[in-house]
Amino acid sequence: MTWSQDLAHKTYSIRHWADGYFEVNDAGHMVVMPLGGDGVRISLPEVVDAARAAGAKLPLLLRFPDILRHRLGKLQAAFVQAQSEWEYAGGYTAVYPIKVNQHRGVAGVLASHQGDGFGLEAGSKPELMAVLALSRQGGLIVCNGYKDREYIRLALIGRKLGLKTFIVIEKPSELRMVLEEAKTLGVLPGLGVRVRLASLGAGKWQNSGGDKAKFGLSPRQVLDVWKVLRGTEYADCLNVMHFHMGSQISNVRDIAKGMREATRYFVELSRLGAKITHVDVGGGLGIDYEGTRSRSDCSINYGLQAYASHIVQPLASACEDYDLVPPRIVTECGRAMTAHHAVLIANVTEVEAVPEGRVPGLCDDEPAVVRHMREIYGELDARPAIELFYEAQHFHAEGLAAYTLGQIDLVHRARIDDLFYAISHGVRERLSHEEKSHRPVLDELNERLVDKYFVNFSVFESIPDVWAINQIFPIVPIERLNEAPTRRGVVCDLTCDSDGTVKQYVENESLDSALPLHVLRHGEAYRIGFFLVGAYQEILGDIHNLFGDTDAVEVAVDGRGYRIAQQRCGDTTDVMLDYVGYALDEVRRVYAQRITAAGMSAAESKALSDMLEAGLTGYPYLSDVPLE
């Protein structure tokens, strides 16, 4: 099949996971469209080159703040349309939970939205302090998470300062503290209750919903809260009903089921006399990381409009059936707002090609196991390929055991490997996925016969969910996409850890154990993009092997196309050492002592001292200069 632009899109499933923000251009470059498909197209290789010319280094995180604004606009538009279709008059507010990505360049861009259609959520005291500064005057702030008196006091101060803070009661003991602190400060609190739904969305994040969820009140506890408030001056303060169905909900039916249960809570609380003005449905809106449009954990089988409709319809029907005032619908869809806006770019530093295998020449003292392997290779065109592979596996294992027992030497051990790889390649050439019986062996061979692409980044720092929960992220070369990839490879990071490897890849609307990649060219960079990393990854990233934050740039759309609006340097080695307790003055003193003790000339001592200082203050990652 002739390679083409369309085939590039299909190979990497780009059109399905990109959601209109990324595509391949005629030059074979990945391009970003921060304003959606009808807006400006920006070449990612050109952006990286411009950032490097300005001093940035790879690995490099690219942020596109215009995507944040566009995602927020699409979310709001979907609910406007759904409310119009269902004749729902309650209104809608998109709340951003800053735990998803607390960086000022993310939360601040979203918070710059003016109007009732946007709010912020905090789940800790530090997040609350940030949100109190970010929110517009009169803006909605949802205060979630476990709380002490200081947290509660700060939230109440926000209300005194003109912010619409709502303290969501997550456990019964919080209510007493809220009422006591409100009385002390002389302010009527904004209150909410988080109800714990029995409905449970399937997937990796299912524990955030359901009866066993970490947060939320049981039906009895909800009644107890209302019992305390009823008949007091605080009864009218209970305005928010909050719940959470899960995160990254893959199946739209789980959303419908959760909303049916949650709507019953709204109806019952209203019938008891609570003035619920806001129903906060929490998160759950997923991202199709896989591009499979399925119920798989890292995919979704619905679109944005379907999500909005499944949220609005049950509430619209309940309000009509029970003659209730429609509450304002609130969502906390942070993943859907932020995932697309960030792309990590990293360069391949080296490739370890899978052995092609060869047939060694005969020798007089050849062990029987080597002869058997040679015979198998000679029968590739005479016997069923699958049977030959099974026999090769048997004798390969026999050869390894013989080597371990000292029965064969290293030379013959290497010959066994050479023959096994030659047989494996020969078997794979003779199998087809069209034949159902071939698929298990073909899948095994495709997993075994892959190159290792060593990439200048850390899985644990930049895409930690790959290691932690087997999260899927689309990975695509950002250039040479007008050429057919001729190799299959796995991505390995720089860390001294076998878990620093990506094990699953998006390919042809499914998942595979390897990725189609290109052969490296001497003196030419080969750069790979890790897409949809804007939610959680920066915040969850750790410092395994002392690899810290990468360099980052913000790329903004302007009248000429784009501009690099802001550049942030990543962590340097001295910063990482200081973080784990090293006294840098002492480190430098030890270096100086050892240089003096080595008895070198003044010039050599100065040169070594300068190199040590450069290493101490340099970027922890490898040089991004192409291999010669």
UniProtKB/Swiss-Prot annotation:
Residue positions where N6-(pyridoxal phosphate)lysine is found in the record: K99
UniProt EC number: 4.1.1.19
Pfam families per record: Arg_decarb_HB, Arg_decarbox_C, Orn_Arg_deC_N
Cofactor(s) of this protein: Mg(2+); pyridoxal 5'-phosphate
Pathway noted in the entry: Amine and polyamine biosynthesis; agmatine biosynthesis; agmatine from L-arginine: step 1/1
GO molecular function: arginine decarboxylase activity; metal ion binding
This protein's record includes keyword Lyase: yes
Example GO biological process: spermidine biosynthetic process
Function: Catalyzes the biosynthesis of agmatine from arginine.
Name assigned to this protein: Biosynthetic arginine decarboxylase
Organism listed in the record: Xylella fastidiosa (strain M12)
Gene name of the encoded protein: speA
